[in-house]
C-alpha cells in the first residue's frame, strides 16, 4: 500500500509573507496543492473591483493577458521561496516568457486556477510550464523562467 501524499496550501496572509507584491499588483489569492517547488495551483478570483478594468475595457472588461502571466510568475515564485524556508532569497526575478498563448478571455466573476510545474532547475535559475484555467478550460499558457537572488 502506498501512503497518500498530503499537498499543502498557502492563504493570502502566507502569500504576503512570501511575496513582496501588494495591492494592486498581488495577482494571486492563495495557492493550493503545493508539492515542494515542483508544482502548485494558484487561485485568482477575478473581480470587477480591480483597477485595470477601468480601462481594459470599460464596456467589456477583460483581464489583460500580461496580468495572467504575472499571476503565473507569482505562483511559481511563491513556491520557490516557500520551499527554501528560512534561507529564502530576497527576491525572485522574472526572466523570460516563452510560448505564451491566450485562448479565452478572462472576465470579472471568473476564477483562474494557475497550474505551475517546474520543468528545469539549474543553480538559482528555474523554468516552469504554466496553464491558467477557468472552469476547466484553458484560458492561457506559457513557459516562464525566473532567478532567485539573495540580498547579500
UniProtKB/Swiss-Prot annotation:
GO MF annotations, alphabetized: (3R)-hydroxyacyl-[acyl-carrier-protein] dehydratase activity
Cysteine pairs bridged by disulfides in the record: none
Major localization listed first in the record, in broad terms: cytoplasm
GO biological process: fatty acid biosynthetic process; lipid A biosynthetic process
Signal peptide (UniProt feature, chain positions): none
Keyword field: Cytoplasm, Lipid A biosynthesis, Lipid biosynthesis, Lipid metabolism, Lyase
Enzyme Commission identifier(s): 4.2.1.59
Record's GO cellular component terms: cytoplasm; membrane
Keyword Transport found: no
InterPro entries noted in UniProt: FabA_FabZ (IPR013114), FabZ (IPR010084), HotDog_dom_sf (IPR029069)
Subcellular location: Cytoplasm
Residues of the active site: 56
Catalytic activity: a (3R)-hydroxyacyl-[ACP] = a (2E)-enoyl-[ACP] + H2O
PANTHER family for the chain: 3-HYDROXYACYL-[ACYL-CARRIER-PROTEIN] DEHYDRATASE
UniProt xrefs under HAMAP family: FabZ (MF_00406)
Function: Involved in unsaturated fatty acids biosynthesis. Catalyzes the dehydration of short chain beta-hydroxyacyl-ACPs and long chain saturated and unsaturated beta-hydroxyacyl-ACPs.
Family to which this protein belongs: Belongs to the thioester dehydratase family. FabZ subfamily.
Name the record gives this protein: 3-hydroxyacyl-[acyl-carrier-protein] dehydratase FabZ
Lineage of the species this protein comes from: Bacteria, Pseudomonadati, Pseudomonadota, Alphaproteobacteria, Hyphomicrobiales
Gene this chain is encoded by: fabZ
Amino acid at each position: 500500500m502506498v501512503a497518500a501524499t498530503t499537498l499543502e496550501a498557502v492563504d493570502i496572509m502566507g502569500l504576503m509573507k512570501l511575496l513582496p507584491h501588494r495591492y494592486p499588483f498581488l495577482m494571486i489569492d492563495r495557492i493550493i496543492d503545493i508539492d515542494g517547488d515542483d508544482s502548485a495551483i494558484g487561485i485568482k478570483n477575478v473581480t470587477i473591483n480591480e483597477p485595470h478594468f477601468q480601462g481594459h475595457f470599460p464596456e467589456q472588461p477583460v483581464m489583460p493577458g500580461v496580468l495572467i502571466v504575472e499571476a503565473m510568475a507569482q505562483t511559481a515564485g511563491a513556491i520557490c521561496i516557500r520551499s527554501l524556508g528560512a534561507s529564502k532569497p530576497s527576491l525572485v526575478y522574472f526572466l523570460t516568457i516563452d510560448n505564451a498563448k491566450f485562448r479565452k478571455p478572462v472576465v470579472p466573476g471568473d476564477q483562474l486556477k494557475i497550474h505551475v510545474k517546474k520543468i528545469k532547475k539549474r543553480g538559482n535559475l528555474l523554468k516552469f510550464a504554466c496553464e491558467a484555467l477557468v472552469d476547466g478550460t484553458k484560458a492561457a499558457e506559457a513557459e516562464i523562467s525566473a532567478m532567485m537572488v539573495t540580498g547579500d
